[in-house]
């Protein structure tokens, strides 16, 4: 079964017609309408695998699926909008679900659909990783964004031109030359 979002009756009819033309029972396409967010997340329990789209990846929808425990399969696109799911999967420790071509995507989708232990293994890893990897670590995200804001403010206060910098895993700023600079010196807080 393929579960899709119900948004456009014309698209729904076209997809059902295309399925029938390819010898697939159109009733195997299930279209689900909008629900309140909590109910929407709850219905994820009946899904086995989230198949991402190209050229525009799922963004919040993929994040919701991962939070609900559904492995997401994606194909890395060429532009930002086609690389979001790859970033999400990397941040939750499941980069093996990021494919580099549509042929690879199709092959892995078929393997996951027919190899229950393989799919179960990804589900179990996702369950373990969800609270241990950066994707859903709100405290870490806050430390990093605060470090970035502090650095931008410091640069502006010194009347320097805006410049590139990164934020290290423990909330330290990485200057372009690679030397970490301690954060929150004005606030006196521990960036760790």
What name fits each language-model region?
Residues 1-3:
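Hydrophobic targeting segments
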Residues 5-7, 12-21, 30, 35, ...:
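C-terminal amphipathic helix plus adjacent low-complexity
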Residues 8-12, 38-40, 58-61, 80-82:
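Flexible loop/turn segments at secondary-structure boundaries
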Residues 11, 43, 47, 81, ...:
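Hydrophobic (often cysteine-bearing) scaffold residues that line and stabilize catalytic clefts
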Residues 21-24, 42, 89:
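Structural motif
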Residues 26, 53-138:
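Catalytic binding pocket for nucleotide-activated donors in carbohydrate/polymer assembly enzymes
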Residues 29-42, 57:
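Conserved active-site histidine-acidic residue motif and adjacent donor-binding/catalytic loop
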Residues 45-55:
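Acidic donor-binding loop of glycosyltransferase active sites
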């Amino acid at each position: 079964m393929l579960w899709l979002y119900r948004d456009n009756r014309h698209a729904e009819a076209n997809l059902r017609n295309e399925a029938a033309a390819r010898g697939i029972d159109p009733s195997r396409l299930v279209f689900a309408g909008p629900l309140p967010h909590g109910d929407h997340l709850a219905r994820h329990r009946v899904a086995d695998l989230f198949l991402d789209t190209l050229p525009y990846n799922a963004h919040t929808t993929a994040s919701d699926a991962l939070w609900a425990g559904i492995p997401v399969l994606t194909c890395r696109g060429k532009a930002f909008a086609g690389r979001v799911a790859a970033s999400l999967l990397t941040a939750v420790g499941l980069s093996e679900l990021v494919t580099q071509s549509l042929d690879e995507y199709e092959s892995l989708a078929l393997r996951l659909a027919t190899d229950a232990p393989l799919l179960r293994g990804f589900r179990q890893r996702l369950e373990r990783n969800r609270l241990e990897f950066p994707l859903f670590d709100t405290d870490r995200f806050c430390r990093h964004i605060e470090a970035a804001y502090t650095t931008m403010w410091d640069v502006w206060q010194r009347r320097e031109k805006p410049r590139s910098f990164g934020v290290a895993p423990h909330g330290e700023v990485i200057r372009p030359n690679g030397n970490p600079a301690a954060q929150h010196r004005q606030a006196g807080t521990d960036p760790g």
